[in-house]
Amino acid sequence: MMKQRISIFLLFTLLLFANGYAQKGIMRLTQQTLMHEVRETPSPLDGQHITVNPPRFMWPDKFPHLGAVLDGVEEEDYKPEVTYRIRIARDPEFKSEVITAERKWAFFNPFKLFEKGKWYWQHAYVNKEGKEEWSPVYHFYIDEHIRTFNPPSLQEVLTKLPKTHPRILLDAEDWDNIIERNKNNPEAQAYIRKADKCLNHPLKHLEEEIDTTQVVKLTNIVQYRSALIRESRKIVDREEANIEAMVHAYLLTKDEVYYKEGIKRLSEILSWKKSKYFAGDFNRSTILSMSTSAYDAWYNLLTPNERKLLLRTIRDNGKKFYHEYVNHLENRIADNHVWQMTFRILNMAAFATYGELPMASTWVDYCYNEWVSRLPGLNADGGWPVSYTHLRAHETDSYL
């Protein structure tokens, strides 16, 4: 009994101590939120001591854009094309050795290490008449022992981008070597087995594949579209895995049977965009992903009409995603599914068609610079932690 009383007393004392400690640790906030959903302040902040050299320059959009709330529920937002200018110098009057740039999005990467000391910068929105609306002049500091992280500029990257295909999943110059290295690779064999299975199971039209027994009972438009997307994604995701298997099987063997069945299957999938059962950004990004992989892997086998079909699909879907992201994604504090999936796919499409699709050069410029501006993380202590399932989303092929 005495031991029980002592235990209760110790527990009570511990709770009082913990409560007192917790009270001391309370942070009183004066702001409405801990962070902005959409950027409202420039970076670097005025007077900031930079943590990584060179700094990435970002500022609020002239026309902040929230985007759609739910995948598949389209919203018409006013989002005009914009032009921004930026200038950076050691003096606040910007009279000598000024770094200047003009961008179609609200960020800029200088790709040069900054000397230690005090720097000044300013950004401007340029209207259609060419009039500049300049921000206040901000200053920041480059300290003595700052970390450096200066990736190559886009111009340097593009000099090393192969002009031949394939060039995304593998480099054509290393193709035969990759095949030889992976003859006994279990992962490579798994792709080939899956592709062989697809050869014996022709694909039906979406309306014959999708299960809509529960969807048709819904009367709420949001629930209806959400359920429709969920059911159609089951089919589209399955076929993405099948096309992926046939693309990989061809790259691992150069056996044209995988191209012939794969392009037939993909052509059927691309016809689904006219179906009332096909909707949503995830489905569109999957279409973009499949078309990009097929275009790059089977480039040398495609007929003129097949190549035209894939390029048109990449152009139409890539254009939509680019327009959705530019002057939106760069100023969102977090948009995790975009970074994991749809934006990554736009990157692949951009580099796969660079030099062959006129607008791909703009996509490449935006995508590459957006990655650089957001790395090595959203803040000085790194990026966001991922769970096991999120790590699975970033898996790559070991045979590559």
Task: Please give the residue ranges for each predicted region.
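Extracellular Ig-like/FN3 beta-sandwich strand-entry sites
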Residues: 116-118
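Bacterial N-terminal signal peptides
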Residues: 9-16
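Aromatic-lined, polymer-binding surfaces characteristic
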Residues: 227-392, 398
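Low-complexity, Pro/Ser/Thr- and charge-rich linker/hinge segments at domain boundaries
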Residues: 141-170
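Pro/Thr/Ser/Gly-rich low-complexity, intrinsically disordered linker/stalk tracts
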Residues: 24-67
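Recognizes extended acidic, P/S/T-rich segments that occur
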Residues: 78, 83-114
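Extracellular fibronectin type III
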Residues: 130-142
